[in-house]
Amino acid sequence: SKPMFMCYYDTTQTEHNTITREGQRVMNLIDDQLTITMYVNLLDKSAPAGMPENQMSNLRELKPFLRFKPDTRLKYVYFYDSTDHSRFRGATASLPLREQMLKICDDEDLDPEFFLSPEEIHRQIDLTSEGNRMIYLLERANGRKSFLRFYDGMDIRPRETEITVALKRLVTDASRIVFLTGHGERSLYWNDKGGLYSLIQRNGR
C-alpha cells in the first residue's frame, strides 16, 4: 500500500512502533517535498543489501518516518564506480571497473545495462567524498541536502537515531566546532581510545 493511503494506530503501551517525539517534530518541520534517493554502487561490498530484492528491508527502517510524511518520494540509482569499500581484493581489484562490473553481473545473473557507468553517475552526483559507497541522499525541494550512511559490520543499515540526525540536518543549520591549538591543548588526533579521534574512528568518519 502507498503510505499516503495507510492509517496507523500504535497499540503498544510504550508506543514502541512510533518514532520519538523529536523525530516527529523534525518530520513536521519539513513542509515541502522530501525525496530520499538510495545510491547503490555495485562494486561496493555492501551492494547486495541495496539490490531491488532487498528494497523492502531498507524501507522497513524508513517506514516509521514516512508515516509522518507520506508524500515522500523514494528513488533508487544503481551504478558502478571505484570505491574504498570494494568487494574485490588482489588481481581482480586491479581490473578495469567495467570488467569488475561485468564479472559481478555474470556471477549474480544481473543485467549490465541496469547500472550507470562512472561517467553517467558523475553527471548526476559526486559521491567521492563518501568513498562512492552505498548511501542515501535526503533532499528537500528548497535545496537542502543530507547524506545518510550505511555502516561496516553485520548491521549495516542506519537506525532511528541516525535517520533522525540526517533529517535534522535538513531543518537546522550545522553547528560550527572550533579547536584551539598551540598552547598545550590535547590534539584532535590524540590516539587514546577515549579520545575524540578514537570516537571519530568508531563512528565511521
Model regions and ranges:
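Short, surface-exposed patches at the edges or C-terminal ends of soluble domains, predominantly
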Residues: 1-205
